[in-house]
Amino acid sequence: MKFSKIACATVFALSSQAAIIHHAPEFNMKRDVAPAAPAAPADQAPTVPAPQEFNTAITKRSIIGIIMGILGNIPQVIQIIMSIVKAFKGNKREDIDSVVAGIIADMPFVVRAVDTAMTSVASTKRDGANDDVANAVVRLPEIVARVATGVQQSIENAKRDGVPDVGLNLVANAPRLISNVFDGVSETVQQAKRDGLEDFLDELLQRLPQLITRSAESALKDSQPVKRDAGSVALSNLIKKSIETVGIENAAQIVSERDISSLIEEYFGKA
């Protein structure tokens, strides 16, 4: 597969996650699925369950469940990013740093898409729905700010400790880093339950930057330096080129079956 297509797959992966939540709010809920009913006889018209029946088959999900659902998709995105790096044989530190900077620059658009998605979910009325999602929307800027703080502190600590090629090491050690963060999040949630805390989100927000920083420090300090070739082309330029190659219209057509073309088009329009 050409590098341009692999790079473009990363954009699809990130934008599709937000788009699926936006256009199919039920994906963001934990389903209690009943066994499928037997097929109707040929001479009998199939029955379509009423919306009320469908809604009652979906259990409400707490804010921790939503967060863990989002975190659950991170390894897949990391694998795609790892594939991009492996597919391109030469990577200079400044190339990766440039990509990281580009991701940070695009983050407001991603956050806006997630914000829109969660707002859409919050506005969807269901039996037994509570204010967990609405509260998450209100606090989204705070969540993002705290996570960004943890990531930035991890990078600063790595530079201070003389870790070579911070960007490459972050990518190469991403699975281990994510695993450590998962463990920390799980431990925090369990501790909150033992302590009888009603607002797990508060506890998680307070500890998430420290969890990320601690995990990244360990992964970067113990990692082997990632070698790079001197004559590589900037990954960021290739990613931008891949978007130009595929084009907005083709991107929208590819994902039209999920009815997320409008969001993809909006996202690519900001690229």
Curated annotation (Swiss-Prot):
One of its GO terms (cellular component) is membrane. Cleavage by KEX2 generates 8 peptides ECE1-I to ECE1-VIII, all terminating in Lys-Arg. Only peptide ECE1-III, called candidalysin, shows toxin activity. The chain crosses the membrane at residues 62-82. Residues 1-18 form the signal peptide. Keywords: Cleavage on pair of basic residues, Host cell membrane, Host membrane, Membrane, Repeat, Secreted, Signal, Toxin, Transmembrane, Transmembrane helix, Virulence. Disruption phenotype: Impairs damaging of epithelia and induction of p-MKP1/c-Fos-mediated danger responses and cytokine secretion. Elicits a blunted type 17 immune response. Induced significantly decreased levels of cytokine/chemokine secretion by host. Fails to induce host mast cells activation. GO terms for molecular function: glycosaminoglycan binding; membrane destabilizing activity; toxin activity. GO terms for biological process: hemolysis in another organism; response to symbiotic bacterium; symbiont-mediated cytolysis of host cell; symbiont-mediated disruption of host mucosa; symbiont-mediated perturbation of host immune response. Secreted protein cleaved by KEX2 in 8 similar peptides (ECE1-I to ECE1-VIII). Stimulates biofilm formation. This is Extent of cell elongation protein 1. It comes from Candida albicans (strain SC5314 / ATCC MYA-2876). The gene is ECE1.
